[in-house]
A protein has these predicted regions:
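Solvent-exposed, charged helical/coil patches
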Residues: 1-8
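N-terminal positioning helix adjacent to the helix-turn-helix/winged-helix DNA-binding module
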Residues: 9, 13, 41-42
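Short, amphipathic alpha-helical "recognition" segments used to contact nucleic acids or chromatin
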Residues: 39-55
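Short Lys/Arg-enriched helix C-cap and helix-to-coil transition segments
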Residues: 83-110
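DNA major-groove recognition helix of helix-turn-helix
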Residues: 50, 75-76, 83
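Helix-turn-helix/homeodomain-like alpha-helical modules used for DNA recognition
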Residues: 113-120
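Short, Lys/Arg-enriched anionic-surface-contact patches
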Residues: 18-42, 67
């Protein structure tokens, strides 16, 4: 059950990245291109796997075909540095998180609405 939920979340995350960076799903899950938009989409996906789903760098290759663990570590560090340096990258990350976890956010907000509506 847990694995199914994770795969659904990853699919939603990939869809958000496809929309944000105007790339195909295969561009996110395969290391076949070094075009900027595709690299950024993979960088966000790599960081999302590591940060939100606690996937170790050595297992990232199971989610992004052809990615070596050293590349995963490099991309994680690069994204963290860019988020500290550039507000636009940090804002893109926040936007991505919102859309990647939209269903959870929507469910959480409806719970809060119910609590405020029925609890004094």
């Amino acid at each position: 059950m847990q694995q199914i939920k994770m795969e659904e979340k990853l699919k939603q995350a990939r869809f958000a990245l496809m929309t944000m960076f105007e790339v195909l799903e295969k561009d996110i899950i395969q290391m076949k291109s070094r075009k900027q938009k595709k690299v950024y989409a993979r960088m966000f996906y790599n960081y999302y796997l590591w940060e939100k789903h606690k996937v170790p760098h050595v297992h990232i290759k199971n989610y992004i075909e052809g990615m070596h663990h050293a590349t995963s570590i490099y991309l994680k560090n690069k994204l963290e540095t860019e988020m500290k340096q550039y507000d636009s990258v940090a804002m893109e990350w926040q936007t991505f998180l919102f859309f990647a976890d939209y269903q959870d956010w929507k469910q959480q907000s409806s719970i809060k609405e119910m609590q405020t509506k029925y609890i004094i």
